[in-house]
Curated annotation (Swiss-Prot):
<dbReference type="GO" id="GO:0042802">
    <property type="term" value="F:identical protein binding"/>
</dbReference>
<dbReference type="InterPro" id="IPR023562">
    <property type="entry name" value="ClpP/TepA"/>
</dbReference>
<keyword id="KW-0963">Cytoplasm</keyword>
<protein>
    <recommendedName>
        <fullName>ATP-dependent Clp protease proteolytic subunit</fullName>
        <ecNumber>3.4.21.92</ecNumber>
    </recommendedName>
</protein>
<feature type="active site">
    <location>
        <position position="136"/>
    </location>
</feature>
<keyword id="KW-0865">Zymogen</keyword>
<dbReference type="GO" id="GO:0005829">
    <property type="term" value="C:cytosol"/>
</dbReference>
<dbReference type="InterPro" id="IPR018215">
    <property type="entry name" value="ClpP_Ser_AS"/>
</dbReference>
<dbReference type="InterPro" id="IPR001907">
    <property type="entry name" value="ClpP"/>
</dbReference>
<dbReference type="InterPro" id="IPR029045">
    <property type="entry name" value="ClpP/crotonase-like_dom_sf"/>
</dbReference>
<dbReference type="GO" id="GO:0051117">
    <property type="term" value="F:ATPase binding"/>
</dbReference>
<dbReference type="GO" id="GO:0009314">
    <property type="term" value="P:response to radiation"/>
</dbReference>
<dbReference type="InterPro" id="IPR033135">
    <property type="entry name" value="ClpP_His_AS"/>
</dbReference>
<dbReference type="GO" id="GO:0006508">
    <property type="term" value="P:proteolysis"/>
</dbReference>
<comment type="function">
    <text>Cleaves peptides in various proteins in a process that requires ATP hydrolysis. Has a chymotrypsin-like activity. Plays a major role in the degradation of misfolded proteins. May play the role of a master protease which is attracted to different substrates by different specificity factors such as ClpA or ClpX. Participates in the final steps of RseA-sigma-E degradation, liberating sigma-E to induce the extracytoplasmic-stress response. Degrades antitoxin MazE.</text>
</comment>
<comment type="subunit">
    <text>Fourteen ClpP subunits assemble into 2 heptameric rings which stack back to back to give a disk-like structure with a central cavity, resembling the structure of eukaryotic proteasomes. Component of the ClpAP and ClpXP complexes.</text>
</comment>
<dbReference type="GO" id="GO:0009408">
    <property type="term" value="P:response to heat"/>
</dbReference>
Length: 207
């Protein structure tokens, strides 16, 4: 069951990860750029939300909590969405751990990406000026016997209801408003995302 119909076309480029060389008292150490940024409590959620990616993000959040449960974690999101169960594992971990998780949308946060964007700590959810956000209802497809199709259809409706409840909780919109707005794809600019309650403000420059 998916929260997005888009495919991730950028996975092959993940092999081209820059390395960072640091001088230490013991000599040189090399890190891939994402590991180096993890030391600064920065996590990237990019591309399709799927099980492997979700497990990596959950592991990074748990590691950073163990290192320092008082310092914020920064989750940068550029995602077209993905699998609901994978996204919910990230969502539940964000709510479970002690540090606040600040979310920042760069590029796009669509579907499950938008859901995770708005799930950040209140007052610490941001968009970059030219990013876009898209919300909609879960997508599902199943082939099989008629009875099984009916079972899966009921499950999709249950998931849709739960997602709408959580979106209403995080945005401050009424459940009825969320249900109307997610019936079809709804795209929002950064200012519109702020007005809707998906994020708290737009970041233009570092403080």
């Amino acid at each position: 069951m998916s929260y997005s119909g888009e495919r991730d076309n950028f996975a092959p480029h993940m092999a081209l990860v820059p390395m960072v060389i640091e001088q230490t008292s013991r000599g040189e150490r090399s890190f891939d750029i994402y590991s180096r940024l993890l030391k600064e409590r920065v996590i990237f959620l990019t591309g399709q939300v799927e099980d492997h990616m979700a497990n990596l993000i959950v592991a990074q959040m748990l590691f950073l909590e163990a290192e320092n449960p008082e310092k914020d974690i920064y989750l940068y999101i550029n995602s077209p969405g993905g699998v609901i169960t994978a996204g919910m594992s990230i969502y539940d971990t964000m709510q479970f751990i002690k540090p606040d998780v600040s979310t920042i949308c760069m590029g796009q946060a669509a579907s499950m990406g938008a859901f995770l964007l708005t799930a950040g700590a209140k007052g610490k959810r941001f968009c970059l000026p030219n990013s876009r956000v898209m919300i909609h209802q879960p997508l599902g497809g199943y082939q099989g016997q008629a009875t099984d199709i009916e079972i899966h259809a009921r499950e999709i409706l249950k998931v849709k209801g739960r997602m709408n409840e959580l979106m209403a909780l995080h945005t401050g919109q009424s459940l009825e408003q969320i249900e109307r707005d997610t019936e079809r794809d709804r795209f929002l600019s950064a200012p519109e995302a702020v007005e809707y309650g998906l994020v708290d403000s737009i970041l233009t420059h570092r403080n």
